[in-house]
Amino acid sequence: SGKSTLLGALAGLLPGQGEVRIGGESLVDLSWPALAQRRAMLPQRQPQLFHIPVFQVLSLGLDEAQSAARQNEAIQALCQALELEALLARDFSRLSGGEQQRVLIARTLLQVWPSLNPGGRVLLLDEPLAGLDLHHQLALLRLLKQLAGQGLLVVLAIHDINLAIDWADRLLCLQQGRVVREGGVELVDEALLAQVFQIKTDRIEAGGRVWFMPSL
């Protein structure tokens, strides 16, 4: 617990102790428009009532200073990566929960998409994999890995420890709102999982990868 609160504080949306800096700038010194240029955040999914086509949902909030051609190029690239092309003309309110989640993820990504906002520094996603099937989880994780490789700091709150080990560079493990482990994925072990999740696990290694499975 505490993941959503931590992300909210990192985004400058919730008060917290200490100081958060993005690119050397303190959040408290940034105006709301400047903060929106530096970071984007997707909160945990809540019901949305957009009775408009998906392409309009994606266009909401885009910088009008950007050319329509550049905006459309970014939207098309995201829709291809997240497999949203077939949904662009559909009414957002009639989509399934998983489809809506993918659209909202794409909308958040557009806020810090490199070709539209070179000043984007941080992407915060709270449970972005919720409601997505395995195929679309993998598509999203591949895209996020690509963006991280281009210099964007990507912070995810997820529950699946095996996905975190596979895809993360660093882990921050919380228990009751307190940090109990921070560092590389190699720090995850059976003792940590027993402490945080109160379960016994078995470590499985194959093909250079590691999984932790609940003991039967």
PLM region spans:
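Catalytic Walker B motif of ABC-type/P-loop ATPase nucleotide-binding domains
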Residues: P118, L123-E127
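Conserved ABC ATPase "signature" region
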Residues: N72-L87
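H-loop/switch region of ABC-family ATPase nucleotide-binding domains
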Residues: I158-H159
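Conserved ABC ATPase signature
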Residues: D91-L95, E99-Q101
